[in-house]
Amino acid sequence: MLSRRHLRVKVMQALFAYQRSGGAELAIGEKLLNHSLTRVYDLYIHQLSLIVEVHSFAKQQIEDGKNKRMPTEHDLNPNMRFVENRVLVQLENHPQLEKHISARKINWSEHLELIRRIFTAFKESEEYVEYMNGDEPNYKDQRRIIYKLYEDYLLVNEHLQSIFEEKSMLWMNDFEQVGEMVVRTISDFKKDVDFGGTLKPMYKDEEEDKALVRDLFRKTATNNLEYQKMIEEKLVNWDLERVASTDMLLMKMALSEFINISSIPTKVTMNEYIEISKEYSTPKSKVFINGILDKLLAELKEQGKIKKMGKGLIGN
């Protein structure tokens, strides 16, 4: 599922695009934002389908060996541990995943040579050799080898990343978040549960998360000039032109959360935007943003403009 932080990042990216368009229709910007979120889930399904594809390739390799004109003893009696891996079998037969793959018409047939190279490299790894030849693996061991395959051979493969980026430029910043979703999916699978378990939903709380995305985008966009003025008033000894555009936008989004999103504590808002700045802005941004937001928050509280609702939120 998409974390609140990733949702904020997606809103930030959508607001940048909206600003670059000269402030086109708000509805168009919001539609593009929702599309970018849907595409994150598409990437999640594509990543899971890759694991299934490697499994299918491994099974086909065994069948090809058996059908050789002069098969070896190894060809006729292959080690089946990997292809019979319980997690892989659960993913392969997962009706929910199969439905998603079919709906998106995902097909890796054009990239079988890349799949072959990836699987060949994986088979040479110390972990794979130990898995195939060591003690009989339990379900935990079976999960662990799939983590190895996914994290070290699929997720970080530059050729695969290029393929994904060609499919959608929107995916460029989503690999880490989606990778975590895939790992959590496998981590939550159970040996004795049909098909392992359910796939991760797109949202933790669909109603609340969609409302956050919608309100944060709309309120930040429509109050852009007001928030700009509020921030400028706090830029003592700072030249406005020296303020990074990312810092300015993150502070506007934080202001929007302070004032308009009643269910999120102000401390959470502060921490989230400071953390986002560490990844998307300058090394000094976290200190700068923290200082400006501290001043703005104190002023807003004094003016009675912070209205937080819910258990443990009043006064935060």
Model-found features: residue ranges?
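Class I Rossmann-like S-adenosyl-L-methionine
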Residues: 1-316
